[in-house]
């Protein structure tokens, strides 16, 4: 995570303009970002009630994928705020660590170009910001109108202090005014071993940060950040204007306090309003310009109607859902014109193509479907509204979308090892999965479902769990994808659906009867996937001219004869694997039980897979029952043994059974 110092000043103005206005250059910007005095970078201009965002084009890998712990880092940047009125600021600016390259849906004024009224304070934001706030907002508990704050997922600071610094000579506190037009430096240092975040503000002419920080937060930041994050800056204005300058910054992957001695510029005051005479001249010029522009626009519009090839209109739902929108030309070039040799697969949903984004080595997968296909606009919106806001290592990451003519496109991270079904329905010469790989894949999918069902702010029902929708990355980790049939609802809400959707064989029996999808219907399909992974067989196979053998029935028959281990694929049937293999087979049969009330919730499934809890000894008697209500009340009180405490939980407890939520 090493960066060199970047000074945004006049000598590199030409270079910076090139990078700034190119989406593949150093910055990706939105809003009122521009170039100000002497070529310095500005986040806002004199426009009221606006915001600006500027993010580095490339992500930084801030978290270790295997340990889940973020690295130590330091950030130093130079800034200045020029207010419209000397004694009154606007709203302020921030340094942001974000899971996305930009913050879609952000608002101006008190929201500082980071959040809006709807998403402010949500744990799913995965955003950490250091605010330089020049407006006291009572709703967010601001201490004054001149302070520095540490914000996690919202605008109510977890720590804040009035602007200033501690003098190294005598330890006295020196006040600073954020709206003084003076260039200042902010140092942000996070030490992972100490789990401490230090923030230090001081005048730019001081070459090294003071020893005592202005703010300190003792907290592990790992739970709030993802593996790949983007660094950026935001600023906003309200009814009072302010120009927020960003002069330069330095990012390091190690803790250090760089000594920086720079020539500090004197910034001009806020532009004054023009006189009435000037306004009259401008009005005349503007009238002429508007007329000329109208004529030119009309000619251009006629030309466009005759020669248009790309239709990209921003609709209201696109602002709401927020993932990055790609230009069609960008995807066209990435997939080499959607050539046949780039095709990864196709089906009723459309086609999936492999591509490489121009200007980078990032490989992507592009799913193309049309409005009139089986997966049309409603499914397209379902996928954007769910996976577009999810960030989890076991879910396929949605990078963005595109609409072109009658086609819809979704852009994902490319999974080089394809889908799980390729390994289960392999050819003779294809490499077989080891038991360790299979068990890891099962746990990865279970972890993803647990996040969807119980850990996110809303409950998400996937509705199409099957091997073809489980993608394998280059480290053989499994990621759940294809949310085209997903439904989401608030925690505790009882969903009603009227349309049966999914893949034949993986649809729970109660879903076929009632059309009502629940988390338990996902558990049913997951149970079948577990069995397929262990057995290396399809859930339904033809054994004779007109006979079909069902995988669950075959495993249950072997279990009844004390031979359930024989159901496993021969290549993994080793004595040292017997315990885990039999556990997964039994758990798979339990999850795919015909009665929804018997199926466990995903939190219980994870406890069993992690060895925290055990299956009850009389589980075979349970799964033999066609309906849970056939069991006597005393027989329903089966025990789920806790390995660590030797205590037990009833099978009917909400911690075990999903209850069809």
UniProtKB/Swiss-Prot annotation:
GO molecular function terms attached to this record: ATP binding; carbohydrate binding; protein serine kinase activity; protein serine/threonine kinase activity
Bilayer disposition of the protein: Single-pass type I membrane protein
Catalytic activity of the protein: L-seryl-[protein] + ATP = O-phospho-L-seryl-[protein] + ADP + H(+); L-threonyl-[protein] + ATP = O-phospho-L-threonyl-[protein] + ADP + H(+)
One Pfam family linked to the record: Lectin_legB
Signal peptide segment: 1-25
Compartment annotation: Cell membrane
PROSITE patterns reported for this sequence: PROTEIN_KINASE_ATP, PROTEIN_KINASE_DOM, PROTEIN_KINASE_ST
Residues in compartment: Extracellular: 26-282
Domain Protein kinase: 338-596
Active site: 464 (proton acceptor)
Disruption phenotype: Increased susceptibility to the oomycetes Phytophthora brassicae and Phytophthora capsici but enhanced resistance to the pathogenic bacteria Pseudomonas syringae.
Keywords recorded for this protein, A-Z: ATP-binding, Cell membrane, Glycoprotein, Kinase, Lectin, Membrane, Nucleotide-binding, Phosphoprotein, Plant defense, Receptor, Serine/threonine-protein kinase, Signal, Transferase, Transmembrane, Transmembrane helix
Tissue: Expressed at low levels in stems, leaves, flowers and siliques.
Gene Ontology cellular component terms for the protein in this record: plasma membrane
Protein name per UniProt: L-type lectin-domain containing receptor kinase V.5
Organism ancestry: Eukaryota, Viridiplantae, Streptophyta, Embryophyta, Tracheophyta
Name of the coding gene: LECRK55
């Amino acid at each position: 995570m090493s960066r060199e110092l970047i000074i945004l000043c006049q000598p590199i103005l030409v270079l910076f303009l090139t990078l700034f206005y190119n989406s593949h250059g150093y910055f990706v910007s939105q809003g009122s970002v521009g170039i100000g005095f002497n070529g310095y970078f500005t986040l806002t201009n004199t426009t009221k009630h606006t915001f600006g965002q500027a993010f580095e084009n490339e992500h930084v890998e801030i978290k270790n994928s295997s340990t889940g712990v973020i690295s130590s880092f330091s950030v130093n940047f130079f800034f200045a705020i020029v207010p419209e009125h000397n004694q009154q600021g606007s709203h302020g600016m921030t340094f942001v660590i974000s899971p996305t390259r930009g913050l879609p849906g952000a608002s101006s004024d008190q929201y500082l170009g980071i959040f809006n009224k709807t998403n402010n304070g949500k744990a799913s934001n995965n955003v950490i910001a250091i605010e330089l706030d020049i407006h006291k907002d009572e709703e967010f508990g601001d201490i004054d109108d001149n302070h520095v704050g540490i914000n996690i997922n919202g605008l109510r600071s977890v720590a804040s202090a009035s602007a200033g610094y501690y003098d190294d000579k005598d330890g006295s506190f020196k006040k600073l005014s954020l709206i003084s037009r003076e260039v200042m430096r902010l140092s942000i240092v996070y030490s992972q071993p100490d789990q401490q975040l230090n923030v230090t503000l001081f005048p730019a002419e001081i070459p090294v940060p003071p020893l005592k920080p202005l703010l300190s937060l003792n907290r592990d930041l790992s739970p709030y950040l993802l593996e790949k994050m983007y660094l950026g800056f935001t600023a906003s204005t309200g009814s009072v204007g302010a120009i927020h300058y960003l002069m330069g910054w330095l990012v390091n992957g190690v803790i250090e306090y760089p000594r920086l001695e720079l020539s500090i510029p004197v910034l001009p005051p806020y532009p004054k309003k023009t006189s009435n005479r000037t306004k009259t001249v401008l009005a005349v010029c503007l009238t002429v310009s508007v007329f000329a522009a109208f004529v030119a626009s009309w000619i251009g519009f006629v030309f466009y109607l005759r020669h248009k090839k790309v239709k990209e209109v921003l609709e209201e739902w696109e602002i709401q859902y927020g993932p990055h929108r790609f230009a069609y030309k960008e995807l066209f070039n990435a997939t080499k014109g959607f050539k046949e040799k780039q095709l990864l697969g196709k089906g009723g949903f459309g086609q999936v193509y492999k591509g490489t984004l121009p200007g980078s080595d990032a490989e992507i997968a592009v799913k193309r479907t049309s409005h009139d296909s089986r997966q049309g606009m409603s499914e397209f919106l379902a996928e954007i509204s769910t996976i577009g806001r999810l960030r989890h290592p076991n879910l396929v990451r949605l990078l963005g979308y595109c609409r072109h003519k009658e086609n819809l496109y979704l852009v994902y991270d490319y999974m080089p090892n394809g889908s799980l079904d390729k390994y289960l329905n392999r050819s003779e010469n294809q490499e077989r999965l080891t038991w360790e790989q299979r068990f890891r894949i099962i746990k990865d999918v279970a972890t993803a479902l647990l996040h969807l069902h119980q850990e996110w702010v809303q409950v998400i029902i996937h509705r199409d769990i099957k091997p073809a929708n489980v993608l394998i990355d280059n480290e053989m980790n499994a990621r759940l994808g294809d949310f085209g049939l997903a439904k989401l609802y608030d925690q505790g809400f009882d969903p009603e659906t009227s349309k049966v959707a999914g893949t034949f064989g993986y649809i729970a029996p109660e879903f076929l009867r009632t059309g009502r999808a629940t988390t338990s219907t996902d558990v049913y399909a997951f149970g079948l996937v577990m069995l397929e992974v262990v057995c290396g067989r399809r859930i339904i196979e033809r054994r004779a001219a007109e006979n079909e053998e069902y995988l669950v029935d075959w495993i249950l028959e072997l279990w009844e004869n004390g031979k359930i281990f024989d159901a496993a694929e021969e290549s993994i049937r080793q004595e040292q694997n017997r315990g885990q293999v039999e556990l997964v087979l039994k758990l798979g049969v339990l999850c795919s039980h015909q009665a929804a009330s018997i199926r466990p919730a995903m939190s219980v499934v994870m406890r069993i897979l992690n060895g925290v809890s055990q299956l009850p000894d009389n589980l075979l008697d349970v799964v033999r029952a066609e309906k849970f209500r056939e069991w006597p009340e005393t027989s329903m009180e089966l025990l789920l043994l806790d390995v660590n405490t030797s205590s037990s939980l009833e099978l009917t407890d909400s911690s075990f059974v999903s209850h069809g939520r």
